[in-house]
A protein has these predicted regions:
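Terminal targeting signals and extreme-terminal segments of soluble enzymes
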Residues: 1-142
Length: 142
């Protein structure tokens, strides 16, 4: 197993504390994963919503960065890390105070880059956002 697979198994199993930023932002962990894909459900806390009960777009971007990183971890090389070099979120519908199904997937992996995308769906299956990122592969210590 690679460091990414080990870490994803720990997060899925609840066997490790989540990083402070994840705890502070209430991003949560991970429900399931396999090579090239990840999945989680997430319920927004009331204090994370706009005054009209909608999801704050910047918060959706933080969730996107997390799920896209999880997806990249499924194919990350054993001898390297990665860093987000580009993140784009397309907002399709207004998100509300309801459970979201979030799925990330690897679109392509080259020697130096991992391309990932994610969908955010409300309980009725309607797409509310789609996110895209490029993860630059960097050697450990680099």
């Amino acid at each position: 197993m690679t460091w990414g697979a080990d870490r994803l198994d720990q997060i899925k199993g609840g066997d490790t504390p989540l990083p402070p930023v994840v705890q502070t932002l209430k991003l949560g962990g991970l429900d399931d994963w396999g090579e090239g894909w990840v999945r989680k459900t997430w319920t927004p806390a009331p204090e994370l919503l706009n005054s009209d009960g909608s999801l704050f777009g910047g918060y959706v971007a933080a969730l996107a960065d997390q799920i896209l990183a999880f997806a990249a971890m499924t194919v990350a090389p054993a001898d390297a890390l990665f860093r987000t070099s580009n993140l784009k979120v397309d907002f399709i519908r207004v998100g509300k105070a309801e459970i979201l199904a979030i799925e990330g997937r690897v679109v392509a992996r080259t020697k130096g880059m991992i391309h990932v995308e994610a969908d955010f769906r409300r309980p009725d299956g309607e797409l509310i956002a789609r996110a895209f990122a490029q993860q630059v592969i960097v050697p450990f210590g680099g």
